[in-house]
C-alpha cells in the first residue's frame, strides 16, 4: 500500500515550477544568487577520524604486497581532502648501499607523466593558445606527411592524441626505450612515417608516441621547452620542488635506484635520461609532491564558488577526469575472491572507471624498467591513494583496491551529499502546504506549464485528497530525505495513519 501511495504522490507533484538557473529562482524567493548555492558536503563530521583508523591496516597491506612481490623499496600515501594525510614506507631505495626508503625518496613515475602533459595542453587551451580540435600537423609539421589508413580518415587532432584515439599502434614497452631520443631523432622518425592500427577517432589504443607528440605541441604553443613550461607553470606554483624530468637533477641521497627481479635476485636497471619522449613518461617525484598533485585534482570537486587558486582552472581539471574514449567493460577478481565489474575509459591523460563500490574512479599507473607507480582517487569521496616501487613494472592496482576496501569498512569512506538550492527548499515547503491543504491559487503558482496539461488540476486535487483521506492529516516534515541535485529532491510527510513520500523536479524555467 505504501508503494502505491508514494508513486501516486510522485505523479501528482512530479513537476513544480522552478528554474534550472538557480540564481534567478533563488533571487525571486530568497534573495540569493547562484554564488550562494551550497556545494555538496560530507554528512559525517567524524569522517576523517574514521578514515585515519584504517592507516595501520593499509600499511600492513602494502608491506605484505611489497614482500610478496620482491619489491626492494616502496612508498605509499593516502590523500584526504587535498592533503597528504599518511605516508608508509618499506625497504631500500638503494639495495647495495642498504639505504632505506623514506617519505622524501624520489621515484620515477613513468606514464603518470601523461597527466602533466594533458594538464599543460588544457592550460594552453584556456589561455587561447591552441584548440583541442587543431590538426596536430598545425603544430608538428612533420605529421603532414602521414599516410592515413583510409581515404576518409580525419586528420589527427590534439583531442585524438589526448585520449589515445589517434590510431597509432599500442607501443608498450617500445616507448619506454625512446625516452632519451633527441628532438631531431624524433623529427626524423615522424618524417619517415608512423603506421596506423586504426583510423583516427574510432578506437582507443594506448600510445606513448602520441603523448610524445603532445610534448612537442606544448613546446611550440608555449614558446618554451616542454620541461621548462611544466616547471614554471605547474610544478613551481604547486610547490612541487622535488619533481623533475631529469634524473641527473635529483640528489644522489634521495633518488631510488631501479631494479628487476631475475634469477631470484635484484638486478640494477640503468636510469633512462630525459629526452624528446619525456612528456609521455619521464617524470620523477616524491610522495609529498605527488600528494600535492593528487590533492589539486580532488580540490576541483565539487564545483563551487570562489577564486581559482591552482595553476589550471577547476573546470578544466574536472574535464580531465571525464571519459573521452570509452573502453570495453571488464570483469576481474579482487584479492578476497569477489568479482568486480569495471567500466569506463580514457579521459585526458587519466583513466576513468567505475566498479561495484565506486561510480567514479580516476587513476593512472606508470611503469618503466626498474619502476612501477600508481595514483588513484575518488572525486566524490575526497580520498586518493599513491604508491611507488623500484621494481620493473610494479603493479599497485591490487593493494590500492584493498586499501579502499579497508577504508570503506570504517564507515568514513562516504561520498558528498548534494545540498538543496534555496529555490528547491522553498518549493518543498510550498508543495508540503499544498498537500496538507489544497489551494487552487497556490497550485497555479507552483505548477509548471505541463503539470495540469498532463493531468487536470481538478484530477490532481482529487488524487491528493484521496490520499489524505487514507493516511489522515499530514505534517510538512523536516528537510529532505534525498537531494539528487540542486533542483530535485524527495522528502517524507508524516501523517496520522502513515506517511507520504513526495518528490519534485523543478522545470527548466524561471519564475515570472
Regions found by a protein language model. Name each.
Residues 89-95, 148-367:
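Short, surface-exposed loop or secondary-structure junction motifs
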Residues 325-335, 359, 387-459:
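Short, gly/Ser/Thr-rich active-site loops of penicillin-recognizing serine hydrolases
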Residues 363, 374-377, 381-390, 502-503, ...:
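Short, well-ordered beta-strand elements
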Residues 59-62, 76, 82, 108-133, ...:
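Active-site SXXK
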Residues 440-484:
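Short solvent-exposed beta->alpha transition segments
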Residues 2-22:
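Bacterial N-terminal signal peptides that target proteins for export
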Residues 48-109, 129-131, 145-146, 183, ...:
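Short, conserved catalytic-motif segment at the N-terminal edge
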Residues 479-512:
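Exposed beta-sheet edge and beta->alpha loop/turn motif
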Amino acid at each position: 500500500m505504501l508503494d502505491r501511495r508514494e508513486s501516486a504522490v510522485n505523479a501528482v507533484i512530479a513537476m513544480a515550477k522552478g528554474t534550472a538557473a538557480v540564481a534567478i529562482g533563488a533571487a525571486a524567493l530568497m534573495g540569493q544568487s547562484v554564488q550562494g548555492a551550497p556545494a555538496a558536503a560530507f554528512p559525517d563530521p567524524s569522517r576523517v577520524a574514521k578514515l585515519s583508523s584504517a592507516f595501520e591496516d593499509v600499511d600492513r597491506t602494502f608491506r605484505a604486497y611489497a614482500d610478496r612481490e620482491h619489491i626492494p623499496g616502496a612508498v605509499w600515501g593516502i590523500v584526504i581532502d587535498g592533503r597528504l594525510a599518511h605516508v608508509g614506507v618499506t625497504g631500500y631505495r638503494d639495495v647495495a648501499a642498504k639505504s632505506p626508503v623514506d617519505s622524501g625518496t624520489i621515484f620515477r613515475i613513468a606514464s603518470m607523466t601523461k597527466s602533466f602533459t594533458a594538464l599543460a595542453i588544457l592550460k594552453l587551451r584556456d589561455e587561447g593558445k591552441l584548440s583541442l580540435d587543431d590538426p596536430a600537423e598545425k603544430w608538428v609539421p612533420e605529421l603532414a606527411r602521414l599516410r592515413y589508413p583510409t581515404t576518409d580518415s580525419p586528420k589527427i587532432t590534439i583531442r585524438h592524441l589526448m585520449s589515445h584515439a589517434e590510431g597509432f599502434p599500442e607501443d608498450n614497452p617500445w616507448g619506454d626505450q625512446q625516452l632519451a631520443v633527441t628532438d631531431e631523432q624524433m623529427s626524423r622518425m615522424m618524417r619517415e612515417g608512423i603506421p596506423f592500427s586504426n583510423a583516427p577517432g574510432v578506437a582507443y589504443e594506448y600510445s606513448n608516441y602520441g603523448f610524445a607528440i603532445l610534448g612537442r605541441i606544448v613546446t611550440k604553443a608555449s614558446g618554451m621547452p616542454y620541461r621548462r613550461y611544466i616547471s614554471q607553470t605547474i610544478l613551481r606554483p604547486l610547490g612541487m620542488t622535488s619533481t623533475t624530468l631529469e634524473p641527473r637533477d635529483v640528489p644522489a641521497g634521495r633518488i631510488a635506484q631501479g631494479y628487476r627481479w631475475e634469477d631470484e635476485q635484484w638486478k640494477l636497471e640503468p636510469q633512462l635520461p630525459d629526452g624528446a619522449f619525456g612528456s609521455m613518461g619521464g617524470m620523477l617525484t616524491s610522495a609529498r609532491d605527488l600528494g600535492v598533485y593528487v590533492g589539486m585534482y580532488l580540490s576541483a570537486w565539487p564545483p563551487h564558488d570562489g577564486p581559482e587558486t591552482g595553476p589550471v582552472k577547476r573546470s578544466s581539471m574536472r574535464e580531465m577526469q571525464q571519459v573521452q574514449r570509452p573502453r570495453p567493460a571488464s570483469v576481474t577478481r579482487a584479492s578476497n575472491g569477489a568479482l568486480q565489474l569495471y567500466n569506463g575509459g580514457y579521459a585526458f591523460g587519466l583513466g576513468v572507471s567505475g566498479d561495484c563500490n565506486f561510480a567514479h574512479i580516476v587513476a593512472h599507473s606508470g611503469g618503466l624498467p626498474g619502476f612501477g607507480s600508481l595514483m588513484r582517487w575518488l572525486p566524490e569521496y575526497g580520498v586518493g591513494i599513491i604508491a611507488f616501487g623500484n621494481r620493473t613494472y610494479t603493479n599497485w592496482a591490487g593493494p590500492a583496491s584493498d586499501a579502499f576496501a579497508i577504508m570503506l569498512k570504517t564507515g568514513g569512506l562516504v561520498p558528498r551529499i548534494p545540498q538543496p538550492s534555496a529555490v528547491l527548499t522553498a518549493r518543498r515547503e510550498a508543495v508540503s502546504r499544498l498537500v496538507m491543504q489544497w489551494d487552487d491559487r497556490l497550485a497555479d503558482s507552483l505548477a509548471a506549464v505541463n503539470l495540469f496539461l498532463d493531468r487536470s488540476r481538478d484530477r490532481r486535487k482529487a488524487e491528493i485528497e484521496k490520499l489524505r483521506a487514507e493516511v489522515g492529516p499530514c505534517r510538512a516534515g523536516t528537510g529532505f530525505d534525498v537531494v539528487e541535485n540542486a533542483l530535485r529532491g524527495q522528502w517524507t510527510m508524516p501523517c496520522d495513519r502513515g506517511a507520504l513520500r513526495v518528490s519534485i523536479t523543478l522545470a527548466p524555467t524561471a519564475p515570472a
